[in-house]
Amino acid sequence: MFYDQTKVILKAGKGGHGCVSFLRQKYMPNGGPNGGNGGKGGDLRIVADVNVGDLRAFHFNPQWKAKNGEPGRGGDQNGKGGEDCVIKVPPGTVVQLRDSDEIVCELLEPDQEIMLLEGGRGGRGNATFKSSVNQTPRQFTDGDPGQEGDYVFILKTIADIGLVGFPN
């Protein structure tokens, strides 16, 4: 069966949380803050690929999600950024919002790439909050959520042949 229209649920990755940590050494009981920042969430991109014939992959698996960013760690270690999710669709695919039927983008050329959803920013660790006034900050920020949405993929095809009249 040929699938030329399908509904999908897409979600970008969430940013990692910041970390609260303090330097610990043998003869230094009160070390400074060294909590790392969280990693950025993965983006969700769409690529037009000539090797994909129809939208069959999205009919049987309608939910696609990018990876989340990792949280920060002690020792000023920042979290790793989330891996991007790359979705391959055939050229001629139109992406529109499911609720409002607004066309978001069209992928007409082969190897055309569009970033549809952006991943969330990573949170800040306590090392970024230190100052001359506040030398032992115990605050951090959470990572931002990634963008998400419900979309409809529509494949526009052009017929190679046309029949006029009734075929016998």
Question: Where does each model-flagged region fall?
Answer:
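Conserved P-loop NTPase architecture
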Residues: 1-167
